[in-house]
């Protein structure tokens, strides 16, 4: 059994990690920390986990971590992970970091998108971007996994078959992402407070969301050329789910059947990708992936405008966060990638 610690386990992502890991047959959760709730039961914060955890949150200590863990999931805010990752790696413990601190390979991008100089450029080179559909082989035996952001995940999974197809007139894409309120975290603030969020469809960071940097990095690798992404997220009143609509312009005609085949071929063998095309539900809808690690992919072609739109629907807390982190961890350990994740979506949701 792999001993696993969850550092920062009181938020929505931490709770979702604990939900998945509670039924993972190859791991044992041995250490869960929270600054705010240290000494209090995990089930006080996550009552849905009653009957699965009979332990309290702990105050973090490097000494205790060394005695208790073979791998660590970090559910900490951006910049805070920087205080933990180097020391944990020095201790010989694997790190799966769910913050943005090690996602970008170019250290200069951190000043542009996050407002700070990255202090560990060498670790950026060693970190593996934890999107298994693109980095399966690199994840094997990875010691530092940088788990992608939810808006970036949805955008990349939608855009990847398109940029791989060599069909675009321009490699400037527009990604419109609708995302549920759980993306904002467990701590309420004015923008995410339920009476303010309910019935809202509210753009935010419309002049350039920082997850665009991840999308550009990954899509450029696939296309083998520079890809630019304008990513505009919208806050909606649902709790879970993210839908990315990625718009591009075609250089030549392509039939729906050919695009269907290209999408299927690109994601061949990927357990959590479902290519969607049906009469009743012709396009992906987050409603049908809630509670699971699946990503539903689809597309539409507007021939009049030579426009193609690729769609991706995910649960932002699963494929957009905790589920994907566990999927990447599984691959790094030589487990089946769906270990602990064989969970069908909820319905109704």
From Swiss-Prot:
Localization terms from the record: Cytoplasm
GO MF annotation, one: N-acetyl-gamma-glutamyl-phosphate reductase activity
Pfam families registered for this protein in UniProt: Semialdhyde_dh, Semialdhyde_dhC_1
Family annotation (InterPro entries): AGPR_type-1, LysY, NAD(P)-bd_dom_sf, NAGSA_dehydrogenase, Semialdehyde_DH_NAD-bd
Positions contributing to NADP(+) binding: 10-13, 316
UniProt-listed SMART domains: Semialdhyde_dh (SM00859)
Enzyme Commission number, as recorded: 1.2.1.103, 1.2.1.106
A GO term from the CC aspect: cytoplasm
Keywords: Amino-acid biosynthesis, Arginine biosynthesis, Cytoplasm, Lysine biosynthesis, NADP, Oxidoreductase
Keyword Amino-acid biosynthesis belongs to the record: yes
GO biological process, one term: L-arginine biosynthetic process
Keyword DNA repair: no
Catalytic activity, reaction form: [amino-group carrier protein]-C-terminal-N-(1-carboxy-5-oxopentan-1-yl)-L-glutamine + phosphate + NADP(+) = [amino-group carrier protein]-C-terminal-N-(1-carboxy-5-phosphooxy-5-oxopentan-1-yl)-L-glutamine + NADPH + H(+); [amino-group carrier protein]-C-terminal-gamma-(L-glutamyl-5-semialdehyde)-L-glutamate + phosphate + NADP(+) = [amino-group carrier protein]-C-terminal-gamma-(5-phospho-L-glutamyl)-L-glutamate + NADPH + H(+)
Catalytic residue list: 150
Main location class: cytoplasm
Function: Involved in both the arginine and lysine biosynthetic pathways.
HAMAP family assigned: ArgC_type1, LysY
Family matches, as PANTHER family: [LYSW]-L-2-AMINOADIPATE_[LYSW]-L-GLUTAMATE PHOSPHATE REDUCTASE-RELATED (PTHR32338:SF11), N-ACETYL-GAMMA-GLUTAMYL-PHOSPHATE REDUCTASE, CHLOROPLASTIC-RELATED-RELATED (PTHR32338)
Family that this chain belongs to: Belongs to the NAGSA dehydrogenase family. Type 1 subfamily. LysY sub-subfamily.
Protein name: [LysW]-L-2-aminoadipate/[LysW]-L-glutamate phosphate reductase
Native source organism of the sequence: Sulfurisphaera tokodaii (strain DSM 16993 / JCM 10545 / NBRC 100140 / 7) (Sulfolobus tokodaii)
Lineage: Archaea, Thermoproteota, Thermoprotei, Sulfolobales, Sulfolobaceae
């Amino acid at each position: 059994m792999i001993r696993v610690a969850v550092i920062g386990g009181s938020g929505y992502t931490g709770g979702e990690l604990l939900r998945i890991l509670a039924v993972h047959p190859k791991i044992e959760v041995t250490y869960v920390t929270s600054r705010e709730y240290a000494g209090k039961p995990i089930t006080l914060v996550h009552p849905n986990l009653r009957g699965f955890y009979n332990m309290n949150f702990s105050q973090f200590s490097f000494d205790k971590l060394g005695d208790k863990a073979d791998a660590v999931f970090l559910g900490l805010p951006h910049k805070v992970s920087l205080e933990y990752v180097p020391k944990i790696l020095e201790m010989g413990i694997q790190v799966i970091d769910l913050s943005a601190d090690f996602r970008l390979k170019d250290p200069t991008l951190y000043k542009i998108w996050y407002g700070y100089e990255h202090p560990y450029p060498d670790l950026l080179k060693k970190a593996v971007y934890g999107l298994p559909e693109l980095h399966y082989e690199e994840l094997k035996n990875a010691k530092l996994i940088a788990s992608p952001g939810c808006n970036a995940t949805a955008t990349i999974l939608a855009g990847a078959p398109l940029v791989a197809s060599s069909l675009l007139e321009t490699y400037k894409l527009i990604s419109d992402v609708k995302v549920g309120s759980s993306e904002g975290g467990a701590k309420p603030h004015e923008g995410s407070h339920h009476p303010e969020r309910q019935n809202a469809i509210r753009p935010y960071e419309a002049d350039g969301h920082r997850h665009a940097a991840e999308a550009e990095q990954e899509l450029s690798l696939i296309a083998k050329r520079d890809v630019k992404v304008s990513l505009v997220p919208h806050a909606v009143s649902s709790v879970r789910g993210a839908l990315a609509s990625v718009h591009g312009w075609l250089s030549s005609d392509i039939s729906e059947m050919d695009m269907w085949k290209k999408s299927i071929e690109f994601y061949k063998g990927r357990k959590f990708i479902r290519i969607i095309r049906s009469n009743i539900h012709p396009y992906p809808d987050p409603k049908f992936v809630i509670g699971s690690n699946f990503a539903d992919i689809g597309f539409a072609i507007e021939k009049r405008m030579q426009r193609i739109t690729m769609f991706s629907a995910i649960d932002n807390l699963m494929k957009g966060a905790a589920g994907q982190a566990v999927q990447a961890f599984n691959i790094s350990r030589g487990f089946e990638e769906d270990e602990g994740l064989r969970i069908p979506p909820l319905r109704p949701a």
